[in-house]
């Protein structure tokens, strides 16, 4: 019997997954509801439409997103192939002519003899091997079906996330490790502020520029957590009873309680990333760097994921997904793209690539592959399936997700080059297997 896989959604992840399947001789039934039913963000009927920016971000190997793109080139990604063909001048970044980019992918995928395209909305998950790659604007009917399948609590609609910072960039001389009232182990890094420092920060925060909301995001703006800048505008002391509450956080150096304290919580298993507790925000990214850099200890903080606020639909991957992108409770069902909690065009396509390869292996009765954590593709799969279940939020690829090198290298560029070299060596070994 001919082996086949259903792929739901022809965005970046679904198109890439489809390509990886047909490359391996697997027939694909590809379902895409556009243009019969449009989303509020899409404008065309093309596959892999870029709805926001036309940039696929940095191209160099001293940047994690450059590394993941190179890994995808090694694994014959159609998304990166198309991006390279449709590229436009953008300094050290890979930016594309968005029409040429999605046009090329649509033509290659649609016209492949093993692909059957179904232009219809899918409202229930089909039987048999299936990849769900329906993105952050998944239609309500299918979202409800996924919710039933993954468990009531495991489909999140979120509208806020706090920034995540690289631990190495925090000034450890200015912060201290402590949990409130010394309960349990000392689990938080604490950034103490004097009254003067707090007032300087407060003034900068309430006058900072926020990012514009897209029309389709407005309805969900205030359904979730309150942005820190909105809280601050309610009064100068509001934050002191909220995220900056100093009680129980006396500074061990002075024995005194600071005027205000920002807590940083470990965000990954390796302890290389920390998030700003309660600091979900909609400030522009440049403003986040400027304003949050006024907090003692964060003057030179490297923000690996900026605080964001927009509508999104994603499953609680640490609870429900394997690092192979398979559902724990149904091994012939794979998820890919932003729905898994990867953030960004390239990351979505990379997850589609991994899910496509693994779905092909599954139907051919071969072993599915857990991509090595040393690779960018593997580090992302590892993060989304092993992060904190309670506070899971979407993540871009970044070097903070990679396992540390055996010996510490202080120079950032040299360290990143070594991480990149190790990642590409790991992915070349995967390429030999698949």
UniProtKB/Swiss-Prot annotation:
Give the enzyme's EC designation: 2.1.1.74
Q: Which GO terms describe its molecular function?
A: flavin adenine dinucleotide binding; tRNA (uracil(54)-C5)-methyltransferase activity, 5,10-methylenetetrahydrofolate-dependent
Keyword tRNA processing listed? The answer is yes
Q: Where is the signal peptide?
A: none
> What Gene Ontology terms describe where this protein resides (cellular component)?
cytosol
- GO terms for biological process? tRNA methylation; tRNA wobble uridine modification
Name the domain of life this protein comes from: Bacteria
- Cofactor(s) for this UniProt protein: FAD
Reactions performed catalytically: uridine(54) in tRNA + (6R)-5,10-methylene-5,6,7,8-tetrahydrofolate + NADH + H(+) = 5-methyluridine(54) in tRNA + (6S)-5,6,7,8-tetrahydrofolate + NAD(+); uridine(54) in tRNA + (6R)-5,10-methylene-5,6,7,8-tetrahydrofolate + NADPH + H(+) = 5-methyluridine(54) in tRNA + (6S)-5,6,7,8-tetrahydrofolate + NADP(+)
List the protein's name: Methylenetetrahydrofolate--tRNA-(uracil-5-)-methyltransferase TrmFO
